[in-house]
Amino acid sequence: MSFVVIIPARFSSTRLPGKPLVDINGKPMIVHVLERARESGAERIIVATDHEDVARAVEAAGGEVCMTRADHQSGTERLAEVVEKCGFSDDTVIVNVQGDEPMIPAVIIRQVAENLAQRQVGMATLAVPIHSAEEAFNPNAVKVVLDAEGYALYFSRATIPWDRDRFAKSLETVGDTCLRHLGIYGYRAGFIRRYVSWQPSQLEHIEMLEQLRVLWYGEKIHVAVAKAVPGTGVDTADDLERVRAEMR
């Protein structure tokens, strides 16, 4: 099947300045992400960035770049600019791969594209089971609950679903009911155009989760269990050192 990967790569980062260009074992991080995307079999891969240094690094690795504005409030807004500049048809399947995921398995990039292509829905994503209490109660681990058909009912930083009887006895085990959302999305290009036309929702501001805008406006998001678990993403200097060690 045919799909396009877009990798948003914003240069500024409060916790890790110049993040796309940090060195991981001899290569800029954004080049590692580009290589994982190539392994997925995508028809076209575009790095969307607001900085010339990132563009030069990608082009030196043989990648395609789309320069975008620096004032976007979200990665989805940056995607929308690329969709318009490249003139993608409304039914084009686009996978948004985060630019700080150098260890993302190529198989899940393709998985989210295939899941979307098989359904009459505008957006798809992935999740993995949560097995530790630490992760279940961590607000940085976003949880998702699904309906019987695998569509998202809600995303939250809170522990959902709340296992009343189990947690009344102990908060040290979580059972097998919690799912952690992964930050990879598949969209149809026409859906991205609609998404950015909607006003931000109250829920996305409360939880700071932009995917809640989709549910707020009554649209569906399909969620599948990922075929592989992504490695560590890079948000901080500590994450960077961990990834360098894991990728040696």
Swiss-Prot record:
The keyword Cell wall biogenesis/degradation does not apply. Pathway: Nucleotide-sugar biosynthesis; CMP-3-deoxy-D-manno-octulosonate biosynthesis; CMP-3-deoxy-D-manno-octulosonate from 3-deoxy-D-manno-octulosonate and CTP: step 1/1; Bacterial outer membrane biogenesis; lipopolysaccharide biosynthesis. It holds the Pfam family CTP_transf_3. It comes from the Bacteria. Keywords: Cytoplasm, Lipopolysaccharide biosynthesis, Nucleotidyltransferase, Transferase. Its main location: cytoplasm. It is found in: Cytoplasm. GO terms for molecular function: 3-deoxy-manno-octulosonate cytidylyltransferase activity. NCBIfam families: kdsB, PRK05450.1-3, PRK05450.1-5, PRK13368.1. PANTHER family: 3-DEOXY-MANNO-OCTULOSONATE CYTIDYLYLTRANSFERASE (PTHR42866), 3-DEOXY-MANNO-OCTULOSONATE CYTIDYLYLTRANSFERASE, MITOCHONDRIAL (PTHR42866:SF2). This is 3-deoxy-manno-octulosonate cytidylyltransferase. It comes from Salmonella enteritidis PT4 (strain P125109).
